[in-house]
Curated annotation (Swiss-Prot):
Domain of life where this protein originates: Eukaryota
Source species: Leishmania major
Described purpose of this protein according to its UniProt entry: Catalytic subunit of a heterodimeric structure-specific endonuclease that resolves DNA secondary structures generated during DNA repair and recombination. Has endonuclease activity towards branched DNA substrates, introducing single-strand cuts in duplex DNA close to junctions with ss-DNA.
HAMAP family xref list: Endonuc_su_Slx1
UniProt xrefs under InterPro entries: GIY-YIG_endonuc, GIY-YIG_endonuc_sf, Slx1, SLX1_endonuclease, Znf_RING/FYVE/PHD
Localization: Nucleus
Biased composition range(s): Polar residues: 161-175, 311-320
Name of the protein this chain belongs to: Structure-specific endonuclease subunit SLX1 homolog
């Protein structure tokens, strides 16, 4: 699965001599690509290297599922006259040049048949450039249609000027009757430019007066946001500071609230991809105006007071918690109002959920007399009216991006389930942790086929976690295709029931068979419209977020283990060093005691003959080395003193072969006892000297 960030960007030149020049390109990191175009980094484009520097980024379009789709968008934007998507509508822009031409092409391209089904996001960096270019394109189109002023008077370029003037007079009269004054179009010179100093106010007035271009208004599949380079980098390009990743302060330590689930709740606050604080606030805001009154007939049943329809309509969607998109309902429609005014949860609302979304304060039980359906809640009445919900209405020759009228929307407004009324941040984090635990153990079934789900291959509803729809990607595609076929059969007016279609001969399999839904479909559980492009985009976004969350958790665990290891090593080093020094002093003291017990007095020669042993010819002919006592050299006491000194030079001097020879000559014989004790003392002194030096270095490193 390709989870990279694909975008197509638009650059314009800041050079006064190249005003209006633009460049269109594709990149996975547009800010780095901008630095390459400006010469700060290598591998820039040839067109931007000759002239036009410095360049600035005006806007970019993201949300493409893969690089092929993004490259198609780039090629269509660069070659609109040769593109099959725009060749029939680009004729209206003939004669328009420079940046206004690129912006006008963008207005048409986002509504093309291929790209209007994708969940795209328009990131605007320089709104002034974009608005001015769009206004100039509007003025150009108004001039092409004959409604422009040259020298203060109207001039017709087509035989329909009379009809246009009549329509202008009618519109002006209608505006005066409605109390709205329609401002006139600004005057143009013979070159098609504005007379005098073109101000942003005049261009904005012209744009507001007549929308000849399809506007870039936010919709369900087109999101528009004004951002800066820093915010854009933090949100989409930085892996460590990505706004898709919940912040460290957002994490909830669930183990403090529930000790029984400490094995899975220790990291639930940092592993939840949702903003748990936003979810809890949305649930409280949804049920803040709802009050319960006890019923005199049944004290176990609580009646919901009249609910304000506009109470929770301004809560943002959890899938776009970090963006400036238009607010959306955190909807859910699995709880139906019965005839007696009691809200009861349908059995289908717990499909694929189980204990993952179980509230601590469970909703009140329904009355015994209240009817309860035994199957999933029926889909809204308008499931077959998908054409009226989101049909691509033509805008001239351009396909509009799924406009929907309020009358076509479902009558009942989706709501948050009652069990989430008392949910807090800890509850949402624990529910997500339990759901992930069931998912990785194969215990979470699909909501459509009931087969176990696998990680990273399931689709959630756009209102998750308030909607419990969890299903395979292929199952949802089949559901949406079946809904499209049913809607097409209803629109045609022919009787094409599933029973009749089952007896029909199977259609031949062809590579041109469409397997990807093109029309939105209501959710089987909550009734919210689901768009295929939006679902795929959210799936990839969730995969990226989960990977980054796992990486963050792994880094946190490694740091914790490293700190614990260091904390265990520090006292161990200190205690080990002290014990080694004590053992060293004990060895030196024992060697000195043995030497004194053998009768060796410092500064005096040995007069008692020691037991001798005859050596062979080789030993007899070997060179003899004088005893250190005969030359007045320091004895074992000096070795002990050298062992206590950390200086390596003194230790080496004490262990030199000329001054510390363990063999003494007495009447042609060797004193083996003295040699043995002296060798042991020399070894102890050598070990003591090196250990002293090592301990000194360790303490030096361990100093604060």
């Amino acid at each position: 699965m390709d989870t990279r960030f694909h975008c197509v960007y638009l650059l314009t030149s800041l050079d006064p001599q190249c005003e209006g020049d633009f460049y269109i390109g594709y990149s996975v990191n547009p800010l780095r690509r901008l630095r390459q175009h400006n010469g700060e980094l290598v591998n820039g484009a040839r067109r931007t290297g000759r002239r036009g520097r410095p360049w600035t980024i005006v806007c970019c379009v993201s949300g493409f599922p893969d690089d092929r789709t993004a490259l198609k968008f780039e090629w269509c934007w660069q070659h609109p006259t040769a593109s099959a998507r725009l060749r029939h509508t680009i004729d209206i822009l003939t004669g328009l040049r420079r940046l206004p031409y690129a912006v006008a092409t963008l207005h048409l391209l986002v509504r093309a048949s291929l790209f209007c089904q994708l969940d795209l996001t328009l990131h605007i960096f320089e709104s002034a450039f974009l608005q001015e270019a769009a206004a100039r394109a509007e003025v150009f189109l108004a001039r092409r249609r004959g409604a422009f002023a040259v020298g203060g008077g109207l001039q017709a370029e087509s035989p329909r000027v009379g009809t246009q003037q009549h329509s202008q007079r009618s519109s002006s009269l209608q505006g005066q009757a409605d109390g709205v004054v329609t401002p006139p179009l600004p005057a143009l010179d013979s070159q098609g430019e504005l007379q005098g100093a073109s101000t942003a106010a005049a261009l904005a007035t012209t744009t507001a007066a007549s929308h000849l271009l399809p506007p870039l208004t936010p919709s369900l599949l087109l999101h528009v946001e004004n951002t800066t380079r820093e915010a854009f980098e933090d949100a989409y390009l930085s892996h460590d500071r990505c706004l898709l990743l919940p912040s460290a302060g957002m994490g909830v330590v669930v183990g403090e609230a529930g000790k029984e689930d400490s094995h899975m709740s220790a990291s639930a606050g940092t592993s939840c991809p949702y903003d748990v604080s936003l979810l809890s606030q949305a649930a409280r805001a949804e049920w803040s105006n709802a009050s319960f009154a006890s019923d005199s007939d049944d004290e176990d049943t609580r009646r919901l007071a009249p609910y304000c329809p506009s109470a929770g309509s301004s809560t943002p969607s959890p899938q776009r918690v970090r963006t400036a998109a238009s607010p959306a309902l955190l909807g859910y429609r699995s709880e139906e109002r019965a005839g007696d005014g009691v809200w009861e949860a349908s059995p289908g609302s717990s499909v694929g959920c189980g204990a993952a979304l179980r509230s601590f304060s469970s909703p009140p039980p329904p009355r015994e007399s209240s009817p309860r359906s035994a199957s999933r809640p029926p889909v809204c009445t308008g499931i077959n009216a998908s054409a009226s919900l989101a049909v691509d209405a033509p805008h001239g020759d351009v396909t509009a991006a799924c406009p929907s009228s309020p009358a076509a929307a479902p009558a009942p407004q989706p709501r948050i389930p009652l069990r989430f009324a008392d949910y807090g941040e800890v509850d949402f984090a624990r529910a997500h942790a339990e759901e992930q635990h069931r998912l990785h153990h194969g215990l979470l079934p699909c909501s459509l086929c009931a087969l176990p789900l696998q990680p990273s291959c399931l689709v959630y509803c756009s209102r998750a976690p308030f909607c419990t729809l969890r299903c395979h990607l292929s199952c949802l595609a089949m559901w949406m295709l079946y809904a499209e076929a049913e809607a097409a059969a209803t629109i045609d007016g022919t009787d094409k029931s599933p029973a009749l279609l089952s007896h029909a001969p199977p259609a031949p399999i062809s590579p041109l068979r469409r397997l990807i839904p093109s029309q939105p479909c209501p959710c089987p559980l909550c009734g919210v419209l689901l768009h295929w492009g939006s679902l795929v985009k959210e799936l990839k976004k969730r995969v990226v977020v989960e990977r980054r969350l796992h990486a963050v958790q792994r880094r946190i665990r490694m740091e914790q283990r490293w700190q614990a290891r260091l904390a265990h090593i520090e006292p161990t080093k200190r205690s080990t060093g002290a014990a080694m020094r004590r053992r060293q002093r004990a060895r030196v003291g024992a060697a000195a005691a043995l030497a004194k017990g053998a009768g060796k007095v410092p500064g005096a020669a040995s007069t008692v003959p020691a037991p001798t042993m005859h050596a062979g010819p080789a030993r007899r002919d070997a060179p003899r080395v004088s005893s250190p006592i005969s030359f007045g050299e320091p004895t074992l006491t000096s070795f002990a003193a050298a062992a206590s000194c950390p200086s390596p030079s003194a230790s080496l001097a004490a262990l030199s072969p000329t001054s510390a020879s363990p063999i003494s000559r007495h009447n042609g014989h060797s004193n083996t006892v003295t040699a043995t004790h002296t060798a042991a003392a020399a070894a102890a002194a050598s070990d003591a000297s090196l250990l002293s030096l090592t301990d000194f270095c360790e303490e030096d490193w361990l100093l604060p």
